[in-house]
A protein has these predicted regions:
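Alpha-helix C-terminal capping segments
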Residues: 16-27, 72
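Conserved phosphate-binding/catalytic region of the ribokinase-like
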Residues: 129, 133, 185-224
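Structural alpha-helical scaffold elements that stabilize or flank donor/cofactor-binding regions
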Residues: 100-101, 161-162, 194
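Short beta-strand/loop segments at the ligand-binding rim of alpha/beta enzyme cores
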Residues: 135-142
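Conserved N-terminal subdomain of the carbohydrate kinase-like
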Residues: 27, 31-112
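Structural recognition of alpha->loop->beta junctions
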Residues: 50-53, 153-178
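Charged helix-capping and loop-helix junction motifs
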Residues: 121-127, 152-160, 183-189
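Short, small-residue-biased leader/transition segments that mark boundaries at the very start
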Residues: 2-6
Length: 224
């Protein structure tokens, strides 16, 4: 069947974070926009099942839900293609941001996929400003997907904006090299630490595990 050939998995980096936190017993909520279509309804049902609040979720009758097609090569490496012209997620406006949800949160998490186009770019910046004004910790995962950007300068601008705003940074080794130009991860972490006011830096290394920086200490953990 088509589903066997193309299995459907609700997801997206921020929702994956929310799902893990919800499973650990934390209260979570999602802010964003999806189409009032089969994919959008599936995403809402999944959030409800995961006990993730959908008070900040907007259903659009005008725009479709964005879909990502993931291809795995023989080494298990992923590549992405997107059906997103124009996706409902891009059309979230400043007025649709659930301000109370942000004000009542301890951590606000975001990535660059909500900064590729307007109006969601301005909506994201407004949400970050609300978090800052209310002393909410800001967590940032660049989650760089080249297919969604017109050029490298635009994504570097978005990543640097996130680096200037976040308290917690989760970044991949490839993204860290992309933004610093350094392939030595220790040096790249120190470069980021010295340039930005970030409290905790987490670097994923794929199958090789992860690194972290916290209170002037750099550590390493092997993969599971």
């Amino acid at each position: 069947s088509l589903h066997d050939a193309l299995p459907i998995y609700p997801g997206g980096a921020p929702c994956n974070v929310l799902s893990m936190l919800s499973n650990l017993g934390y209260k979570t909520g999602f802010i964003g926009k999806v189409g009032n279509d089969g994919f959008g309804k599936l995403l809402k049902e999944t959030l409800d099942k995961e006990n993730i609040s959908t008070d900040g979720l907007v259903l659009s009758d005008e725009y479709n839900t964005t879909a990502a097609f993931v291809h795995l090569d023989e080494n298990g490496e992923r590549s992405f293609s997107f059906y997103r012209n124009i996706g409902a997620d891009e059309m979230l406006t400043e007025d649709e941001i659930n301000e109370e949800m942000i004000k009542n949160s301890k951590i606000f998490h975001f990535g660059t996929l909500s900064m590729t186009n307007e109006p969601v770019k301005s909506a994201t910046k407004k949400a970050i400003d609300i978090a800052k004004e209310n002393n909410v910790l800001i967590s940032f995962d660049p989650n760089y997907r080249p297919a969604l950007w017109k050029n490298d300068n635009l994504v570097k601008e978005a990543i640097e904006y996130g680096l200037n705003k976040c308290d917690i940074l989760k970044i991949s080794d490839n993204e860290l090299e992309f933004i610093t130009g350094m392939n030595d991860m220790n040096e790249a972490i120190i470069e980021i630490k010295n340039k930005y006011d970030i409290k905790l830096i987490l670097v994923t290394l794929g199958e090789n595990g992860s690194m972290y920086w916290y209170k002037n200490c750099i550590g390493y953990r092997s993969g599971f």
